[in-house]
Amino acid sequence: MKSIILIAPPAAGKGTQSSLIEKTYHIPHISTSDLIRKMISENNEKYGELQKSLDNGILISDDIILELLKIRLSNKDCSNGYILDGFPRNINQAYCYEEILKELNLNESIVIYLSLDKTIAEKRVLGRMVCPNCKSVYNKYFIETSPK
């Protein structure tokens, strides 16, 4: 199984599609945002400044993102494929990702771009809500995703 990279604007459904692919093909869904949150939650000394950067609206450096990704991709569960959500975000990350693939002896990835009209994207972002009890994400503007 090849690995899959999902690229799309915010609220286009990367997470939703990744979850469906993950369940169907039994490959892990890797989100760079989740990797960062995990490091912050573990109070890892090496990544102690991450929360401050995020709080100040500063993008996390490519070096840190690539280091976290390389660590995650070296796990055994990625050897048969994985889904990358929200990565790469720039050309440098794409080139470095190719090097990581070679270094870890992983297959090349299939890239899927999810298109979304800007008006719909804005409506999805503004209507996005998280259930405080079950943590399910839904949208108050779209009936198919509203809570039952």
Model regions and ranges:
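Glycine-rich phosphate-binding loop of ATP-dependent small-molecule kinases
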Residues: M1-K148
